[in-house]
UniProtKB/Swiss-Prot annotation:
Pfam families assigned: tRNA_m1G_MT
Name of this protein: tRNA (guanine-N(1)-)-methyltransferase
PANTHER family: TRNA (GUANINE-N(1)-)-METHYLTRANSFERASE
The protein's assembly and partners: Homodimer.
Gene Ontology BP annotations: tRNA N1-guanine methylation
Subcellular location: Cytoplasm
Highest rank taxon of the organism: Bacteria
CDD domains xrefs: TrmD-like (cd18080)
Function, in words: Specifically methylates guanosine-37 in various tRNAs.
Chief location category: cytoplasm
UniProt gene name: trmD
GO molecular function annotations of the record: tRNA (guanine(37)-N1)-methyltransferase activity
Species the sequence originates in: Escherichia fergusonii (strain ATCC 35469 / DSM 13698 / CCUG 18766 / IAM 14443 / JCM 21226 / LMG 7866 / NBRC 102419 / NCTC 12128 / CDC 0568-73)
Length: 255
């Protein structure tokens, strides 16, 4: 996968290119990241990249000409088929389904805004899609862009150490992840669930699915509203609810 970055602070993306899963992907040639700074496309000695908004008000906007020229340079480098994305609070909210959808693109250009944003006409003429990582304000689009790159890169074949890792991530099936355990077997009196030590892979799969369903029901119940549960999933969720109610009753009785 090839990803182009339009940013006033391209050095921030060393967190992606030099470390962790994405750093290994870059090193192994599975992910290529290039960056363009609008500051390199300015024509004044101060390398100005911001301008006042029409209509007044606080803050500045990114200057149109350097930004457009940077986008055009990235498009030229990408060639045919690159999708241009603007990271914006007004965009479609990123979720696992959206990540999976974006991962089908071989070329992405990510435009990172700064100040109060960018000229609406640049969005209309240069941007294919707007994406947001949440309903809150950040100082720029770099962190959202890094979030998008990290999540999308997990779908690139060969990036993760285990082929099933991406499909078993939280939200991959619309559910939260199940609890995980490693050594020691007993930690301050808390034991690993016996089923995980049993070696019975069918029972382990069933336990993990039940816990995943139950955790989603407890913490993010709205996610279940959008799912058509299978017969097995519905049965396991009912079991979890019954066991949870029994535990709550036992806890209340001890209180």
């Amino acid at each position: 996968m090839w990803i182009g970055i339009i940013s006033l602070f391209p050095e921030m993306f060393r967190a992606i290119t030099d470390y962790g899963v994405t750093g290994r992907a870059v090193k192994n040639g599975l992910l290529s990241i290039q960056s363009w700074s609008p500051r390199d496309f300015t024509h004044d000695r101060h390398r100005t990249v911001d301008d006042r908004p029409y209509g007044g008000g606080p803050g500045m906007l990114m200057m149109v000409q350097p930004l457009r020229d940077a986008i055009h340079a990235a498009k030229a480098a990408a060639g045919e088929g690159a999708k241009v994305i603007y990271l914006s609070p007004q965009g479609r909210k990123l979720d696992q389904a959206g990540v999976s959808e974006l991962a089908t693109n071989q070329k992405l250009i990510l435009v990172c805004g700064r100040y109060e944003g960018i000229d609406e006409r640049v969005i209309q003429t240069e941007i294919d899609e707007e994406w947001s990582i949440g309903d809150y304000v950040l100082s720029g689009g770099e962190l959202p862009a890094m979030t998008l790159i990290d999540s999308v890169s997990r779908f690139i074949p060969g990036v993760l150490g285990h082929e099933a890792s991406a499909t078993e991530d939280s939200f991959a099936e619309g559910l939260l992840d199940c609890p995980h355990y490693t050594r020691p077997e007993v930690l301050e009196g808390m034991e690993v669930p016996p089923v995980l030590l049993s070696g019975n892979h069918a029972e382990i799969r069933r336990w993990r699915l039940k816990q995943s369903l139950g955790r989603t029901w407890l913490r993010r119940p709205e996610l279940l509203e959008n799912l058509a549960l299978t017969e097995e999933q519905a049965r396991l969720l009912a079991e979890f609810k019954k066991e949870h109610a029994q535990q709550q009753h036992k806890h209340d009785g001890m209180a």
